[in-house]
Swiss-Prot record:
GO terms for biological process: translation. Keywords: Ribonucleoprotein, Ribosomal protein. This is Large ribosomal subunit protein bL19. It comes from Thermus thermophilus (strain ATCC BAA-163 / DSM 7039 / HB27). This protein is located at the 30S-50S ribosomal subunit interface and may play a role in the structure and function of the aminoacyl-tRNA binding site.
Length: 146
């Protein structure tokens, strides 16, 4: 077994598969575990994904938001156990892979450049409806057996 295969084998145990798929331009809410002193709490960070750096297990993504008129960017490791969950607030349609140019734009210009991606939103809603229907169908036979 060569070195690369061994590294992939070890890393595969820690890869997260429970997180949703997202792209640059999407607005996401990241729930991140923060340790303050002797207690831990969950902190939400909501903003636009401006970059995804794919590097296997070391994949990171950058989220940008404007808080009280100041732009804040945070880099999250995708496979970190400190990430509780990632919620996709809105799907965006970006024409670039790296959205560094939005650092210089106003909120109004950002909304115009990153329009909502209706096709991906509709696919997500259809998938959610199908999943709910499957759960309901699975529960109906159980109720009739009782």
């Amino acid at each position: 077994m060569n070195r690369g295969a061994l590294i992939k084998l070890v890393e595969s145990r820690y890869v997260r598969t429970d997180l949703p798929e997202f792209r640059p331009g999407d607005t996401v809410r990241v729930s991140y575990k923060v340790k303050e002193g002797n207690r831990t709490r969950i902190q939400d960070f909501e903003g636009i994904v401006i970059r995804i750096r794919r590097n296997g297990f070391n994949t990171t993504f950058t989220v940008r938001k404007v808080s009280y008129g100041v732009g804040v960017e945070r880099i999250f490791p995708l496979h970190s156990p400190l990430i509780q969950k990632i919620d996709i607030v809105q799907r965006g349609r970006a024409r670039r892979a790296k959205l560094y140019f939005i650092r210089n734009l106003s909120d109004r210009e950002i909304r115009r450049k990153l329009r909502a991606d209706r096709k991906r939103i509709d696919k997500d809603r259809a998938a959610e409806r199908a999943a709910k229907e499957e759960v309901q169908k699975a529960q109906e036979p159980e109720a009739s057996q009782e």
